[in-house]
Amino acid sequence: MGTLSVNQNKLQKRIRRLAGEAITDFNMIEDGDKVMVCLSGGKDSYTMLDVLLYLQKVAPIKFEIVAVNMDQKQPGFPEHVLPAYLESIGVAYHIIEKDTYSVVKEKIPEGKTTCSLCSRLRRGTLYTYADEIGATKMALGHHRDDILETFFLNMFYGGTLKAMPPKLLSDDGRNVVIRPLAYCAEADIEAYSQLKEFPIIPCNLCGSQENLQRQVVKEMLQEWERKSPGRVEIMFRALQNVHPSQLADRNLFDFKSLKIDDSATPRFLDVMSL
């Protein structure tokens, strides 16, 4: 890649800055960490690896990076692409070979979305492998738009207010998951991926099918952003500005104990005495 244009340089700086801010805000990476970067071959994970390699050079702390890809034995998967790329940039890597493709095809009826089961099988395998290699952090490539889409998916279809946290402790307490791109917009990542000419590998398991519910939410957010530029960022900031007393979850706020405080100073004027 040659000299960057002004806009390309701004894009690179923005992604690096936002990733650095997310890592700092949530204390994602600490001195001495071994970060397992989960590399799928998509634009998000390539961008995450690229940014982490840069931050590794300039950060005031020392941490190790190891890239891990899971070969799920999908027909036509170009298994040479990732090793060739990682060797070309000098990054240590592991390829996990596990035939989850056959499991998914066996369990999911023809025509149904395979994303959910595929994701669970992959996540479980990666958790186990991170433990085996002594990784202290497991980095995933989810970005701001993924997090917000998940929030609306859970609200619309699951009746719960939750998203993807930038930092997560696994249920068994053995893995810490981090999402360094949590503050980055998908459009920026797409542009950065094209700029860097990453060797993208499409998902052939399902013919690159979209999860239909997620696609509906994605299109909704895109339409909102088109009509009101900046709305997506405002909504994302709302996830960091939660007021439990203004919601209705009795587990988060003790509504039953609310009582009038007779000793409190009145906030309003006595209009009848004016």
From Swiss-Prot:
GO cellular component: cytoplasm
Keyword Cytoplasm: yes
Similarity remark: Belongs to the TtcA family.
Annotated GO MF terms: 4 iron, 4 sulfur cluster binding; ATP binding; magnesium ion binding; sulfurtransferase activity; tRNA binding
CDD domains reported in the protein's UniProt record: TtcA-like
Compartments, as annotated in UniProt: Cytoplasm
NCBIfam families: PRK10696.1
CC cofactor: Mg(2+); [4Fe-4S] cluster
Record has Cell wall biogenesis/degradation as a keyword: no
Pathway: tRNA modification
Extra remark beyond the main annotation: The thiolation reaction likely consists of two steps: a first activation step by ATP to form an adenylated intermediate of the target base of tRNA, and a second nucleophilic substitution step of the sulfur (S) atom supplied by the hydrosulfide attached to the Fe-S cluster.
UniProt-listed InterPro entries: Rossmann-like_a/b/a_fold, TilS/TtcA_N, tRNA_Cyd_32_2_STrfase, tRNA_thiolation_TtcA_Ctu1
Keywords: 4Fe-4S, ATP-binding, Cytoplasm, Iron, Iron-sulfur, Magnesium, Metal-binding, Nucleotide-binding, RNA-binding, Transferase, tRNA processing, tRNA-binding
Motif (PP-loop motif): 40-45
Name listed for the protein in its UniProt record: tRNA-cytidine(32) 2-sulfurtransferase
GO biological-process terms attached to the record: tRNA thio-modification
Free-text remark on how the cofactor is bound: Binds 1 [4Fe-4S] cluster per subunit. The cluster is chelated by three Cys residues, the fourth Fe has a free coordination site that may bind a sulfur atom transferred from the persulfide of IscS.
Pfam families: ATP_bind_3
Substrates-to-products reaction catalysed: cytidine(32) in tRNA + S-sulfanyl-L-cysteinyl-[cysteine desulfurase] + AH2 + ATP = 2-thiocytidine(32) in tRNA + L-cysteinyl-[cysteine desulfurase] + A + AMP + diphosphate + H(+)
Gene3D superfamilies noted in UniProt: HUPs (3.40.50.620)
SUPFAM superfamilies associated with the record: Adenine nucleotide alpha hydrolases-like
EC number: 2.8.1.-
Complex and partners: Homodimer.
